[in-house]
Every structure is written in structure tokens, then in C-alpha cells.
Amino acid sequence: SWDNLGTMLCCHRDYQLGDCNSNRETELQLAEICRKYGKSDEEIDEMTFSEEIQFILDQDDVCGLPLWIYDHSGISMSTRRQCSWDSSFVGLIFVEKDFYLAQMCLKDEKDWKAKAKETLEGEVKTYSDFLEGNVYQWTLYEPIIEIRQSMDGKELSRKIDEEGEIVDSMCGFYSLTFEDADAYFDFEIAEIEQID
């Protein structure tokens, strides 16, 4: 399963982004949150998308960040505008204070917003890696070796299929550096060798 602390509410005419399955679902979620923090249905009906976002971001019990996409031969997401031409404001990522403190097992409320902001920025970075295709997997193969022998046991030929049987695999690695990958693969190979 995939667990994030933040909720992403986004609207875009071309892309389905964030935690909602449609722009309409995002609009309903935004209205519900505005209602929770004191806005009437009439006030919500008069608010623009940006005004609803700003209202939520201004709440003391909410830590949130605006979300922007950069759309040029693919898309990426950030909490800051990347470019005046190809960037679009698409929504927000937020977490409410009570939920954050409970999930992080924190009793001390001091600096909760700064800590939550750091967490949310990391979640946006990971989501952007997903949008950009910076997600990796590894597969460990055990080669299959075919040896043909004569009747007296002499080797006649040897055929090695490097991509033989799959021994193990794992996916869901984001923004790996080669050093990260090497360290992880070395650990996994050592574990498998111990089992054998």
C-alpha cells in the first residue's frame, strides 16, 4: 500500500492529478474543507478555485503548499512556479494538524508546521518523480546453462541464457542514484547468497 500524510487536490483540463479521480471530485473536496473551517455554501459558491485554496492555506490547523506543474514535453510538479510560460497552478497539498500529530506520534505541537512542510515537500518530489517516469525496478535472474556432452562426458557446447529464471524483483524506487542502487543490489545479492 502507499501511504502519504498529505492530500493533493488538483484541477487541470488535460491531466488527472493528485488524490481525486476528477476535477468535480476535487471541487467537492475543496468545498467540504472550506465548509469545515467556517465558510457557508453561499460563500463557497462565490469563491474561485484559487480563493478556496488560499482560504485553506490560511487556516492555523492546516499546513499546505500550492502545487504547480511544469508542462513541456512531459510534466513535473513543484511547490513553486518553474517558468512563466509553461507552468500552471493546479491546486494544493495539505495536512491537518491533528492528523499530522497523530500519524507522526508527536505530542509536542511546537514547529509542527515546519516539520509537516518538509514532509509535504518530499511527497511532492516523489510524486513529480512518478510523473516524470523516474521510477525504477530491478530484476535478479539466475542464468540457465545448457551443456551438451558426448557419450563419454566431454563437453561439446555450452549455451548460457543470461536472462534465465527470475529469482527476485522489486520496483518502486524513486530517483535512485547509481550509488543507492549498487548498495541496495549488493545487499539483496548477499541475502540471496546466504539463503542458497
Model feature map: region roles:
Residues 1-196:
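Acidic interaction surfaces
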